[in-house]
Structures are given as structure tokens and as C-alpha cells.
Amino acid sequence: MASVPVYCLCRLPYDVTRFMIECDMCQDWFHGSCVGVEEEKAADIDLYHCPNCEVLHGPSIMKKRRGSSKGHDNHKGKPLKTGSSMFIRELRGRTFDSSDEVILKPTGSQLTVEFLEENSFSVPILVLKKDGLGMTLPSPSFTVRDVEHYVGSDKEIDVIDVARQADCKMKLGDFVKYYYSGKREKVLNVISLEFSDTRLSNLVETPRIVRKLSWVENLWPEECVFERPNVQKYCLMSVRDSYTDFHIDFGGTSVWYHVLKGEKIFYLIRPTNANLTLFECWSSSSNQNEMFFGDQVEKCYKCSVKQGQTLFIPTGWIHAVLTPVDCLAFGGNFLHSLNIEMQLKAYEIEKRLSTADLFKFPNFETICWYVGKHILDIFRGLRENRRHPASYLVHGGKALNLAFRAWTKKEALPDHEDEIPETVRTVQLIKDLAREIRLVEDIFQQNVGKTSNIFGLQRIFPAGSIPLTKPAHSTSVSMSKLSLPSKNGSKKKGLKPKDIFKKAERKGKQSSALGPAGQLSYNLMDPYSHQALKTGPSQKAKFNMSGTSLNDSDDDSADMDLDGSENPLALLMANGSTKRMKSVSKSRRAKIAKKVDSARLVAEQVMGDEFDLDSDDELQIDERLGKEKANLLIRSKFPRKLPRAKPCSDPNRIREPGEVEFDIEEDYTTDEDMVEGVESKLGNGSGAGGILDLLKASRQVGGPDYAALTEAPASPSTQEAIQGMLCMANLQSSSSSPATSSLQAWWTGGQERSSGSSSSGLGTVSSSPASQRTPGKRPIKRPAYWKNESEEEENASLDEQDSLGACFKDAEYIYPSLESDDDDPALKSRPKKKKNSDDAPWSPKARVTPTLPKQDRPVREGTRVASIETGLAAAAAKLAQQELQKAQKKKYIKKKPLLKEVEQPRPQDSNPIMTMPAPTVATTPQPDTSSSPQPPPEPKQEALSGSLADHEYTARPNAFGMAQANRSTTPMAPGVFLTQRRPSVGSQSSQAGQGKRPKKGLATAKQRLGRILKIHRNGKLLL
């Protein structure tokens, strides 16, 4: 058995807890306590000689000091080391931006959870006096020796050597001796003495706001097998010239500091994305101790915290600390729900920087799992009670859920599963939390519209403009600035600060008799336990958002003005009572009710299927709507009886932290009401290519103006060119001509079909009895097998035409609108349709459901495209020539009915159009491709040749240059259509009638196809 190696003069085995030093001569190891070498002094030794080697080689050699050349012998151009005496001297003399630009200075009684919710805990807060903070501290006569008495002199602590910016271990008793020694060879700083488990903890109580916000205080279970994170109480003992370099507190925690004695100077940097990126690069650089991070950012603020003052630094702020005089302070770190996303971001930065465990938040991921479970309970409880969470809680829940998904991925799970509590079902928690968040977001998108501060409140006064250190008798008011999008882009006027305080003071006087003076107290982490309500002259007033949730018309622009005669705003006082500033007239109330109804009707369209709330596959984003229509975006497959947000109507209700003043109201609107609301909305707009394609294909939209919405009018120049072409072709433009009759049939059929569909109910297009609906019922979807293949092909080709109807074109290119999507069928070849397809574009997440139509784009008058006019003229000339040739060949053709079909419109042309799902330019029904294996394409194309729609530029280009001879519903480009199809008809007809020899190169179908392909590939009019 091998013997255990022993070291040092004491000949004991290695002990990891004891400091040891190696002799540079004999290479043996010695305990520092055995040879008289302290750990903090070992860094100054260049060559160490043990007691045995000291006899032969002399004493240990110390490092040469360069302090004698402080002022005049300094090397020029050499950077200063962070923490050195020269660095501290230069730092003291530098000028920084004043922190008064960013920090808030409320009184202790004003600093409540409600204050942080309204003002957002995103900037530092300096409280000049501890009164009202609910904090317990020792008397100012408390000293470092008293700390040693309550903690114990044998307590091992972490001490920072400021000159080296390195950490070392030291007993508290030894540090106290150093602190009171007359000559300090080094600058030592104690900033991480956590005393929660010592007797000193009985003398210090954290601020009330910290106790209410802290996750550890409120959410950490007592029976948890993981060790409870103790980061709430720290004692900081710093000597003069102590300096802590720039850092973010572990886990993105917020921090509070109270200076009991002395002074501390904080250098603060805002945690913007750019600054965080710079900080990460600076922290990972090899010469970090030679660069002052404050020089790399745009602004670095200086904040002095003097004796008796308390500073709260929010999540993510990058800060450094300088101690100008000996200082004794208390502080602590805490995680909270006000900025969860930033906390997670700071945690990820720590992981990327490979921060040591000593400087990390203990069990950070464990507490996050508990918080995720708690937020889920909050969402469920608020929804069951018809209340709504605040925006910071929704954003925090989303950030947590994203982190949970990342931590539980298969490749990352081994690194994170050790911190997952056994009581948490991770997969179910992620799914339920995503469901609740989606419910909350959908409720507001369906009823209120997209706005950044619907869930929460916002501060309206910039930092420093109105001091928050007003006397106790003044009333502080904060208002939510709702910037809902309106039609004219205007925003509601804000209140002047003077008017706000005047009104608030009057209301405060009226409610001062309701109870004793005090503050409203909340517990953020326990939304179901209510604190006692108190009111008083210093109570906070908050605007109820009733009347501000709709901003759809111009007459709302001046409603926020307090000087007006009508104002729907009400002050919600701290006791829950609602006091209305001005009486709202009946006409104004009627306008508000009307707008609420109209918004509700548009938002709650009838959907064919139920919304699967437990499925993440139903999420869908449609980015083709413009900003002006963003507030009318309808989410697909939403439940029919969806709870709806409405302003709070109970004046005595207590608002919980993490909640806004809204109630949920169940929806009992009938389908008849919805049809009226949707038709009224659709009647105000006009169609455009892209959105109406989906509406027509899914057969969900009907209305009296539907036919007018489906086709954009041609420009005057195009219409003149078409008329000229018809005249040159000897075609009459009266109603008897095939072109006019076919166009008239299409228009009349579209009108009759749309009127019939609107009378039968929303979502039906065909006038057949099978598609009729009764009021109050859900729309009946037609089964896929009701449609044959020819109908699907017609629908596909019609959608292709309509999708390009509103696009600008010239002879060579098509110019789609900016709103066109990559999946637009007009921009790529359409794949073969399935029988059960509802003609909706493929989406990786969901099926696309009807959206609202776009507005008409103005047609540019007087614009002419030379290539188009040239093509029209050439096509018209060839048409006239072909008509003459056809008249000469009539006597040789036996099939007289075929020519009648060409020259005269058939009486049944208007009938098949009635059953088409969308307006079409075709006037002849397609034969069933399944029943007719080889349909004669040429006569069918001839019947379409006289249609006015043949000469409009709505043909969809084939991506592969294939001839579209068999697709009657998709007209070709003007030049190609007229020069190639008619000769083939004549040759084929004459060949069938008398066996006349065909033209050279056009004898077989293959030759004719090759001729057409060549024209497609090289023709000037190729689209």
C-alpha cells in the first residue's frame, strides 16, 4: 500500500483548505501558517526560500516596487493598471455625467410596488433618508469591531486585493486588525460577507420593497432539497481608495446599498444592447485590467451615496464602485418579476464568460422554475377572475418560457437537469405557460388592438423634470399614455403637469376623510393575499383606462384634455373608489359604445374550426398587412365565445400587483350581428391583389360590395388601347359583341352571386341549397369531394389572375406590391392542388384564414408603356388579318356549329359563372378533365378569343415557359395569345373538314408546341 505524501515542516498530508507556498529552491511545499507567510502577502514574493534553504541561499526575494516613480518617473504610453494608486488618483480627478439625468429620488414612503410598476424599475433610485423604507439597521455608531463581535473572528471571508483585483481568503479577525492598523501596506476590500446565518442578521432588516419583490423571500419552498440562496444581506467593509471594477451583479440581480458610515461613489452605465455587447467583449479581453470600461461607452454617470442614503440599482446596470473614505455599508441582491428578460440575459452573459461559481447566483435556474410555475398560477387566477396581467409579467413569462425550452432541449438537458426541481413537470409547465400567454395576447389583439402599454402603466414625466421628493401633502399622479394607432396617425393629447397636480390635489382632499394617512401596500408575489387598504393625503392616484382603449376616429383627439366639457377619464384612487373628473354626455357615451361594438364585431369573425388552445401548431403570423390595418388583424381559429377585455367597472375592487384595470366580458354576439359588422367593415374598403385571394379561396367573405372588390380598374391608357384593338379587328363594342357580352355576363354573375351569398350568411359563396346557412349557426364547410378537378383548376387559374390584377406590369416584367409574400402564388409556379385543399397557401404553422381587404391604390393617370401599346397594335393587326382569312375559308369548313361558337356568345355563358367561387374572365365552362381524357383545346380557346379580358394584362407567367394551351381560364400575353392560337384553330379545322395540307412546320401537335415554346422563350412580349 502506497503511503500518503506529506508536506511542510509539520509533515502532514495535503489539506485543500489551508494555504501553501512552494519553495523555489527545494521545490517542497509549506503551509503558510507554518512558515509565517500570509496568503495576501505571497503575491509580493518573487522568489521564496523556505527556512531550510534560507540558511544556504539567503532570505526570500521580494518583487521590486515601482511606487517611487509615482509622479515623474512613470513610463510614457504604458497603460495604468486598474486599482493602482495612479489609477485611483486619475479616477478621482475625472469628470463624469451627473446621475441626476437618469435616477429617481422618491421618498421612502413613495417607493412602493405600485410606484415601480408605474415608473418601471429601469433606472437607479436614490432615497435620501431611510424613513419610510421599512428597513432596520444598526445605529450609525456601529463599527467594524461590532461586526466581528456578531459574526465571529474565525469567520473566513473573501477579501479583494484592490491593486491586483484578485480575491483571497482571510479570517475576519485578521481583517479587523488590518482595518485598524496605522500602516496599511495594501488596499483590501470586503464586499461579500453574507451574514444571513449569523447573529448580525437580527440587527438588519432589508427594505420592505425588497421583501415584497424578492423571489427567494416569497417563492423558495421550505421543503426544497436545494440549498436556499442567501444573497439578501451583505456587509461591506471598505478602506480608503478601495475600488471594484465594472460588473453586473450575478444573475442580473438588482441590488440595494445603504451607507451606514462614510461614502461610496458609483459609476453607472445603462444596460443597452450595445453597452452589454461592449461589456462582454471587455470582460473577455486579455488586457481588461488596462482598460477603463467607462471610456468605451457613450455615457457613464457618477452617483455619490453619502452616509444615511440608500441606492437601488435595477437589473443589468453595469457599475463600478469607488470608496473615497473608510466606509461601512449594508446591501443585498434580489431577483424580481419586473425585468425577467434582463435577468436571463445577464445570466447568459455570465455563462458565456465562464464566470466562477463563487460569483454566480446560487441555484439560479431552480428559482426560475419555481417562478415559472408561480407566473402560470397568476395568469390562471387572473383569467378566472376576469382580470389581466401587466405587460412586464407577460413579457417575463415569455422570456422564461423561451429559457425553459432552451434548457430542456435534448442536447442541453444534461447541463441543466441538475437544477430542475423534482416537483416541476417541465414539459407540461412549458406547454401550459405558452397557452396562458397566448390567451392573454390574443384577448388584447382581438379587442383592444396592438399597443405597447395595454398591459401596464407608463411614466409620463422624464427623469428630473418633476422631482419625486415632493412634500407629504402633495399627491403624485401617474397616467398611462395610451398611443393606440388611429386612422389619421394622431395621438391623444397628454395632460399638462400643472393640471394633473391641481386635479389630483382636489381629489385627494375629497378622499382624505375616508381613512387615516398611509400607503397602499401590495405583495407582488402573492396575488391572492390582500393587504389592508389605506388612504390619505399622500395616496397615489391612477387613471382608469376606460375610454382610452379606442382611438379610431378624429373626434377622440381632444378627449384627454381636462379643460374640455366632456372627458371619459376617471381617477381611480388608492382606496378603489372611482371619481369622474367631468361628466360624460349621452352622445359621447353613445359614441364610445358604438366604437366598442364595431371593434368587437370585426375582431370576432366566425371561424369554421375550433381553436386548439393546447397546440402550438396553430400559431400563424401574417405580415402582409400594412401598418394602417395592423389593429384589424384576425388570429386564425379563435374560440367563438372568447372572453373580451373591458374597462374595470367595479370601483371598490382591489388591483393586485401585476394586473391592469380591465375585466373580461364573455361574448354572446350572434352570427347575424357579426355578418352586419363584417359587411360594414368590408364595404368601407376596397380589394387589392394578395389579401382577397385568400378571402375568395377560403370562401369566408360575402357582401353586397364583394364583386366591386375583386378587380382593380384598368388605367385609361389601357382601356383606349383595347378599344382601338377591337375597332381594328372589326369587332363591335356594343353589348352584342362577344367581348362585351362576356364581360357583362361576368359582372352580372358576380353581382348576383355576391348578393345571394350575403343573404344566406357569411362564409357561403355558392347559391346551392347545400351551402345555405341559418342565422346563429356556424358556417357549414363544403366537403372536398363536392368539387371536381375542373373546378379546382378553374379556382387555381382565377386566383392567379386576380393575384396579379392589382400589380403594375410592362412588356417584360411584373411588379408585385411590397406587401406580396414569398408564398404569393403569382410569384412562383403553383403546385398541383389536392382535392381536400381549401386553396390556402402552405404554412409551416397553420392554415391561412380570411383577412381583411386592403385599400384601393390610386391609379396613375396618363402613364403609358410603349411596349404594351406596340404589342396591342401588333396583336390587333394580326387579328384583323386572321378575320379576313377566316371569312375566305368558311365555305370549306363543314362543322358550322364550331364557327357559331366562335362568332356568337352562347346563351348559357352566364350560368356556369354563377357557381364559380371568384369572378372570372372566362365565359365558357371547362369540361371535366376526368371524364374527357383528350378535350379539344383549340375550339375552347377560340370561344375565349373575343373576350375583352383576353387583352388585359392579367395572365400569370409560367415559370418554365410551358405553353398554356389547355388552360382556358388563364389568357396568354396579348401578342402570344393572338398570333399563335388562331392559326392552329384554322389549320386544324380545315384539316378535319377537307384534309387541306397544313402550313409548313405546323402539321403535327409536336411541331406546333415547339413553335409556341420558341415564341415563349424568345418573344419580346414574354411576361
UniProtKB/Swiss-Prot annotation:
Catalysed conversion reaction:
N(6),N(6)-dimethyl-L-lysyl(36)-[histone H3] + 2 2-oxoglutarate + 2 O2 = L-lysyl(36)-[histone H3] + 2 formaldehyde + 2 succinate + 2 CO2; N(6),N(6)-dimethyl-L-lysyl(9)-[histone H3] + 2 2-oxoglutarate + 2 O2 = L-lysyl(9)-[histone H3] + 2 formaldehyde + 2 succinate + 2 CO2
Query: Cross-referenced Pfam families, in alphabetical order?
Result: JHD (PF17811), JmjC (PF02373), PHD (PF00628)
What are the start and end residues of every segment in region (Linker)?
Answer: 65-79
Amino acid composition bias (Basic and acidic residues), ranges on this chain: 854-863
How does the cofactor attach, per the note?
A: Binds 1 Fe(2+) ion per subunit.
Q: List the SUPFAM superfamilies hit by this protein, alphabetically.
A: Clavaminate synthase-like (SSF51197), FYVE/PHD zinc finger (SSF57903)
From the Swiss-Prot or TrEMBL record, state where the protein is found: Nucleus; Nucleus, Nucleolus
**Which residues belong to any copy of the JmjC domain?**
195-351
PANTHER family (alphabetical)? PHD/F-BOX CONTAINING PROTEIN
This chain's function reads: Histone lysine demethylase with selectivity for the di- and monomethyl states that plays a key role cell cycle progression, rDNA transcription and brain development. Demethylates mono- and dimethylated histone H3 'Lys-9' residue (H3K9Me1 and H3K9Me2), dimethylated H3 'Lys-27' (H3K27Me2) and monomethylated histone H4 'Lys-20' residue (H4K20Me1). Acts as a transcription activator as H3K9Me1, H3K9Me2, H3K27Me2 and H4K20Me1 are epigenetic repressive marks. Involved in cell cycle progression by being required to control G1-S transition.
Q: What is this protein called?
A: Histone lysine demethylase PHF8
This chain's source organism reads Mus musculus
What gene name is given for the protein in this entry?
Answer: Phf8
